[in-house]
Design a protein with these regions (language model features):
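Active-site glycine-centered loops adjacent to acidic/histidine catalytic or metal-binding residues
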Residues: 9
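Short catalytic helix/loop segments, enriched in acidic residues and glycine
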Residues: 20-35
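Short acidic/histidine- and often glycine-rich active-site loop of Leloir-type glycosyltransferases
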Residues: 16-17
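Conserved N-terminal catalytic core of the sugar/cofactor nucleotidyltransferase
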Residues: 2-5, 13, 31-101
Length: 101
């Protein structure tokens, strides 16, 4: 089942934290609030997400795009070009995520 998460607010009440990143990306325990929300839904079998991002959406998109780079061991083989990058021991989540503007 798809779960829609509204993540486009400005975070005005926590402006000292949200000045540089959107509210869903403020970290708690080393992970963004958005990750904690998704983990909660995932616990109950909801693993397909549509994230409606607005304010600073590029930060949310970058976080998901770089997820494996942050959470896995990586070998960069510069002798054969960028396409020969190997991600070892991938830390996977059972999620399918779509980030919309």
């Amino acid at each position: 089942m798809k779960t829609v998460i509204l993540a486009g607010g400005f975070g005005i009440r926590i402006s000292e934290e949200s000045r540089f990143k959107p509210k869903p990306m403020i970290e708690i325990g080393g992970q963004p609030i958005l990750w904690h929300i998704m983990k909660g839904y995932s616990h109950f079998g909801f693993n397909e997400f549509i994230i409606c991002a607005g304010y600073k959406q590029e930060i949310i998109k970058s976080w998901f795009a770089d997820y494996f780079l942050r959470n896995s061991d990586i070998t960069f083989d510069f002798t054969k070009g960028y396409k020969n990058t190997i991600i070892h021991d991938q830390h996977c989540e059972p999620w399918k995520v779509r980030v919309c503007a």
